[in-house]
Amino acid sequence: MDIKGALNRIVNQLDLTTEEMQAVMRQIMTGRCTDAQIGAFLMGMRMKSETIDEIVGAVAVMRELADGVQLPTLKHVVDVVGTGGDGANIFNVSSAASFVVAAAGGKVAKHGNRAVSGKSGSADLLEAAGIYLELTSEQVARCIDTVGVGFMFAQVHHKAMKYAAGPRRELGLRTLFNMLGPLTNPAGVRHQVVGVFTQELCKPLAEVLKRLGSEHVLVVHSRDGLDEFSLAAATHIAELKDGEVREYEVRPEDFGIKSQTLMGLEVDSPQASLELIRDALGRRKTEAGQKAAELIVMNAGPALYAADLATSLHEGIQLAHDALHTGLAREKMDELVAFTAVYREENAQ
């Protein structure tokens, strides 16, 4: 099926099969469609609502065309990632949580990009911290193996995305591609915490990841709108484990953490996000730093559980608390800065 045939189906509110979606996505991602066709396709899909079959097909093609990262093992390797688009403009929680997971003994294959709608994307934050991002796949793999955390810059590993960049930017709306980023980790991780911008996506995306071979995944959305675990409200979870998807909710009090507002955690730049994270992972001199530390723990703990390094969310949160409060997480951030500095010089030659 070509994109014209797909558009004809979509405007009549007819779904595509997985195979049909794969055919259309290959055309888009290999430069065989016009910007007008891509924009119409994305808007049509959004208005119709994407099915699990369609998302599976789109993800499969993006993974196929990605510049992958080969790791010696995927055991205990996890990604903490969100779709973004929650409008909260709080600091980069998932990036900070990645260093806590590494400090607790996990391996993090972090996949991310620059900000699209927010003030600071994961790439913006890490660049502000002095972490070199233009790494080869082999260099990322060494970061993960040696430091315990490596960052895969989406625009480096998904070069075919350039064909959809213009239409996405001009539309200025959430589209299918907002869902695809967290599902197309170049290392092929099978353990993830995926934050989404609406609760309606939790179970469908867990089902998508199940079909694509994931093993232990938490797809989450907080009742206050965050695409991650929140301190201010209950968090809805669709958990994929042992081949089954179940849904439930948790609150901070379930883990001995006090519910509180997120006031003071908003940032207006990558530098502001970095300063708050350094305080949270360090001595926590400010009230905002103390609150940020609790939010980081609330998100790092589930990642340790998804990585099967903890037998429960409660145990994962305790492990994350210990790793943050020993200062090891702050050391992991500094270690990644130093480790990637070598590659900055190497790649410049």
UniProtKB/Swiss-Prot annotation:
Pfam families: Glycos_trans_3N (PF02885), Glycos_transf_3 (PF00591). Anthranilate 2 binds at residue 168. Belongs to the anthranilate phosphoribosyltransferase family. Mg(2+) 2 binds at residues 227-228. It comes from Pseudomonas paraeruginosa (strain DSM 24068 / PA7) (Pseudomonas aeruginosa (strain PA7)). Homodimer. Mg(2+) 1 binds at residues 94, 228. 5-phospho-alpha-D-ribose 1-diphosphate binds at residues 82, 85-86, 92-95, 110-118, 122. This is Anthranilate phosphoribosyltransferase. The lineage of its organism: Bacteria, Pseudomonadati, Pseudomonadota, Gammaproteobacteria, Pseudomonadales. Catalyzes the transfer of the phosphoribosyl group of 5-phosphorylribose-1-pyrophosphate (PRPP) to anthranilate to yield N-(5'-phosphoribosyl)-anthranilate (PRA). Anthranilate 1 binds at residues 82, 113. Keywords: Amino-acid biosynthesis, Aromatic amino acid biosynthesis, Glycosyltransferase, Magnesium, Metal-binding, Transferase, Tryptophan biosynthesis.
